[in-house]
């Protein structure tokens, strides 16, 4: 748990927890604006650019991130995907993505895409990668 949340945690047993009530409702549904969606997989990267919900661009690019030790390979691949999609939009209002792993506050805490990256490079270059991308 410490690796995921960056703190030690102690979880009480489920029996001692307050009853959980699940609500059913719609999330999102906001299609307005110029948006990019991406998915980072183990064998390809996918991206789509939409304007007001209408797809203007969609692409799938082969890549092999799993055992790549250099975090720049991952960063450059992700940026390439986003830039390709952005070329089809007059502006970018929002970006949403998906990738297997654990992410907290847009930081990578653990993800199989980066399994080849050593601990030092992971902490220095991977953990805050999506925050760096958001700034650019």
Predicted segments, located by residue:
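Gly/Thr-rich phosphate-binding beta-strand-loop-beta motif of the actin/hexokinase/Hsp70
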Residues: 21-56
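Active-site-proximal loop/short-helix segments
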Residues: 52-54, 99-104
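Short beta-strand segments
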Residues: 39, 96-98
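Non-catalytic propeptide/linker segments at domain boundaries
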Residues: 1-33
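Glycine-rich phosphate-binding loop and adjoining helix at the ATP-binding site
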Residues: 1, 62-79, 94, 101-136
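Short, flexible, glycine/charge-rich loop motifs used to bind or transfer phosphoryl groups or to couple energy/partner
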Residues: 26, 85, 132-133
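Residue-level detector of high-confidence beta-strand sites
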Residues: 58-60
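Short amphipathic alpha-helices and their capping/turn segments at secondary-structure boundaries
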Residues: 34-37, 75-92
